Swiss-Prot record:
Name recorded for this polypeptide: Probable nicotinate-nucleotide adenylyltransferase
Catalytic activity from the UniProt record: nicotinate beta-D-ribonucleotide + ATP + H(+) = deamido-NAD(+) + diphosphate
Record-stated family: Belongs to the NadD family.
Cited SUPFAM superfamilies: Nucleotidylyl transferase
Assigned EC number: 2.7.7.18
Organism name: Chlorobium luteolum (strain DSM 273 / BCRC 81028 / 2530) (Pelodictyon luteolum)
GO terms under biological process: NAD biosynthetic process
Protein's UniProt keywords contain ATP-binding: yes
Function: Catalyzes the reversible adenylation of nicotinate mononucleotide (NaMN) to nicotinic acid adenine dinucleotide (NaAD).
PANTHER family the UniProt entry points to: NICOTINATE-NUCLEOTIDE ADENYLYLTRANSFERASE-RELATED, PHOSPHOPANTETHEINE ADENYLYLTRANSFERASE
EC class (word): transferase
Length: 194
């Protein structure tokens, strides 16, 4: 079994996250995807509670499952002492799936901070790493020069920051997030300007 591990704050999950999961299915190819909701120790919290982020990640997993891929959500990292670290998540996943081929899915923006992550070499020992880079961006020498990293060109002109900004200014989120996530954001009153 090939298991893709997709960690992030998912504050909120958006159509770019959905597309990354579908790309992982086709290009890795991954049989299953594990969506791990976490805090980012390198960034400040943005607004949704842990419970709300888990709820929205569950809605994202339902969208992924509708495409025929098996997706599940874990809040394991949120239950750990803060900050939690990717290497610890991968150790946990490896203990639960000792025979699985693991691939960590990382966006290019997150990978830029990879040298600051806890135990990067341990991460490489536990899993392959697939970096999704935005099309049209200059290729980073750091990524291009690392044979342990698989780069996947990816075009998703949406980010969680954009979704939060649109929500705060009352702009429509249609086309930026799955419909169910949009309804959740609206019903919970998330990301409104204070």
């Amino acid at each position: 079994m090939h298991l893709a591990v997709f960690g992030g704050t998912f504050d909120p999950p958006h159509n770019g996250h959905l597309a990354m999961a579908l790309f992982a299915r086709e290009l890795l190819p991954a049989d299953r995807i594990l969506i791990s909701v976490s805090d980012n120790p390198l960034k400040p919290a943005c607004g949704a509670s842990d419970r709300q982020r888990l709820d929205m990640a569950e809605l994202l997993s339902l969208e992924i499952n509708r495409t025929g891929m098996n997706a599940e959500v874990t809040g394991w990292e949120l239950q750990q002492p803060r900050p939690s670290y990717t290497v610890d998540l991968l150790r946990f996943v490896r203990s639960s799936h000792p025979d699985a081929n693991l691939t960590l899915i990382v966006g290019e923006d997150s990978y830029q901070d990879f040298p600051r992550w806890r135990d990067p070499e341990g991460i490489f020992a536990l899993a392959d790493v697939a970096v999704f880079r935005r099309r049209g961006e200059d290729e980073s020498d750091e990524i291009a020069g690392d044979s342990r990293v698989r780069c996947i060109a990816f075009d998703a002109p949406v980010s969680s920051t954009m979704v939060r900004e649109f929500s705060a200014t009352g702009k429509s989120l249609r086309g930026l997030v799955p419909e169910t996530v949009m309804q959740y954001i609206l019903s919970e009153g998330l990301y409104r300007e204070a």
